[in-house]
């Protein structure tokens, strides 16, 4: 039926009176080609006034109502893919070329010649001038990196690490300036550099617009709240009494009992001088001027210096303190 409609269209077609207008005709089939199936891939376009020059378009077929259909055979499934209907044959040919290049790439057979475009690969990491400017403001140690590493990443590794860490360490580094020693292990020498972290981080934040986190004061946070609550509770509690010093022996010359021992030795020395000066011819001595006397056999009177010293020795013995010097 389609063949009959095509023959009817050809018989009723009249030439355009305007010689500058294009008109399209189907190619006449030769006696040899009549036996084979008609191909729907090619369409002959004849331009009036241009002689006998003809143009064939692959994958374009003219409809009886004057429009042009484009289709292509899928190389994988061997099926025809419908591309659409167009007003002109050139539009249908362009649609076929696009589909052919999508299926077969550079090996596709197209109706028109297309220039081979050289596609430049985009860099893996592209840094603008604003992002690379903080390195000029903040001096960093120059590391001897390989040239292939710089070409692949587009920037030195030290700069990328610094830009990444400056986002998370902004609040911690804004209140201090540190001088960090840097050991150059490649050249065998040691050097130091001083960089202001406050200026670097603030400049990088303003230029790169990397304010991902809200700015907070340095005295905020969970730890600060815990410390404040702890201080509030301790304000109403009275201070605990100081711990007593540990009990030490006479051999230890520190603490309370060492002072007691020194005082005891001085008191024994004074007592000896007093006794030696007041011994009488009977072997008795007068301890004080208040009339209280003591016998040399060891008996002591209440209120004398000897009694106070003996009481002190007894108190020291109960606490574990021993004296090296004996009585008398």
From Swiss-Prot:
Keyword entries, A-Z: Activator, Auxin signaling pathway, Cytokinin signaling pathway, DNA-binding, Ethylene signaling pathway, Nucleus, Transcription, Transcription regulation
UniProt GO molecular function: DNA-binding transcription factor activity; transcription cis-regulatory region binding
GO BP annotation list: auxin-activated signaling pathway; cotyledon development; cytokinin-activated signaling pathway; embryonic pattern specification; ethylene-activated signaling pathway; plant organ morphogenesis; response to cytokinin; specification of plant organ axis polarity
Tissue: Expressed in shoot apical and floral meristems, and in organ primordia. Transient expression during shoot regeneration.
Compartment(s) of residence: Nucleus
DNA-binding region: 56-113
Family annotation (SUPFAM superfamilies): DNA-binding domain
Entry's Gene Ontology cellular component terms: cytosol; nucleus
Residue spans of biased composition, Polar residues class: 41-55
PROSITE patterns membership: AP2_ERF
Broad class of the protein's primary localization: nucleus
Induction pattern: By cytokinins.
Region of interest: Disordered: 1-55
UniProt family annotation: Belongs to the AP2/ERF transcription factor family. ERF subfamily.
Other facts noted in the record for this chain: 'Dornroeschen' means 'Sleeping beauty' in German.
Summary of subunit composition and partner proteins: Interacts with class 3 HD-ZIP proteins such as ATHB-8, CNA, PHB, PHV, and REV.
Function per UniProt: Regulates gene expression patterns in meristems and thus modulates organ development. Required for correct embryo patterning and cotyledon organogenesis. Modulates auxin signaling pathway in early embryos. Involved in the cytokinin signaling pathway that promotes shoot regeneration. Acts as a transcriptional activator. Binds to the GCC-box pathogenesis-related promoter element. May be involved in the regulation of gene expression by stress factors and by components of stress signal transduction pathways.
Protein name: Ethylene-responsive transcription factor ESR1
Organism of derivation: Arabidopsis thaliana (Mouse-ear cress)
